[in-house]
Amino acid sequence: MTTYLVQEDTYNTNNLDFKIRRVPESFSTFVIDFKAFFGVRPQHVSRRFSISLSDLSYQPKIYNPRADWAVTAAFTSFEALQASTLDPVQRFATIGTGSGTDAIAALDVFPHLRSIVMTDLHDEVVDKAKINLMSAAEKADGRVRTVARDATGLSGHSLVPLKGQEPFDLIYENLPNIPLPDDADLLDGQTSSTYFDCSDVSGVVPSFVSKALLDLHYVCLLQARTFDLLTESGVVLSSMGGRVPIDTMLQLADAAGFTGRIPSMSWKVQSEPDSVIEGYATLQEKGLGPFYFYRVSTLRHVFGHLTGAEAGLHALEIENELLPDRLDAVMALKAHKQGIDIGHPVVVMASTRQ
């Protein structure tokens, strides 16, 4: 595997200078500095590691970590969970892993981790993710290297690939929200990172969940319970863009037979804004939602220097503080086209069985 390093650029996010090694976009291998990407020094994985991507992999936002889900949702929520629970996370699964950076985050945060399962829709995506996980553990201690080496990659929809597995202490999911347009193909590039085939869940999901475009998050909880995939104290972490009320998310958990809470909350720049915001705007005009976005300047001001865990403790207060400045999807699309940077809160819900 060849790595191409061309130059080193500096970005400023939340008053931290992030140095990212730039690689030509035509190549599919990158070198990531852990601190540059996640914002803190690694505890257990290698300080620098390479990642390889399939054409079908969700592209990590290495040039703008504030737009990356592994940074704003996975790593932040893992830290919050590790700090708030006495139950060690030993068995971990990530659903829709993409490049595998969420699994790398788990390997670094959870000191008792002994088993990782990564899933995605495509075999080649999870194959690359496994390679990336091993790269991140290359210079780590023996336990970490063994966990990475023995990690399992499975392909399939939602939690179906996990059926029959030994129960997990933690299942993390960050699944798409927008129904697949008639003229789109889930096998085309990164389409499956943004869209899902709503025919797969037709008739299963409560109407209030579908109206909020949270279908797959509900399905994951339902499958976790039906397939008996959680230990007695096991948790499902659902990573959701805060474009709908937090109360709707908590009601979703209850409808699936779980008790939900918000251990972590952050914000991110809207990635792929042309297609994503337009997708939400189109569906809002058809009667779904409404869906809300915010100017990046507003999000930066309201969240300030709060950690994910601190923001999670005050999630409803933050939501109320943002209300006067919210833009529905149609307004957000217009603002984006005017050159205004648009983002949204990132809400991670922890669900335990009732």
Placement of each model-derived feature along the sequence:
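C-terminal beta-strand of the catalytic ATP-binding
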Residues: 175, 351-354
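Mobile active-site "lid"/loop adjacent to the S-adenosyl-L-methionine
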Residues: 172-219
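Conserved SAM/SAH cofactor-binding pocket of Class I
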Residues: 68-183, 187
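Conserved Class I SAM-dependent methyltransferase catalytic core
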Residues: 208-268
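Short, surface-exposed amphipathic charged segments that create phosphate/polyanion-binding patches used
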Residues: 274-286
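A generic structural motif
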Residues: 144-155, 261-274
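Short aromatic-enriched loop/helix-cap "lid" or pocket-rim segments at secondary-structure transitions
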Residues: 179-187, 249-251, 273-276
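SAM-dependent Rossmann-like transferase core, predominantly class I methyltransferases
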Residues: 4-112, 292-350
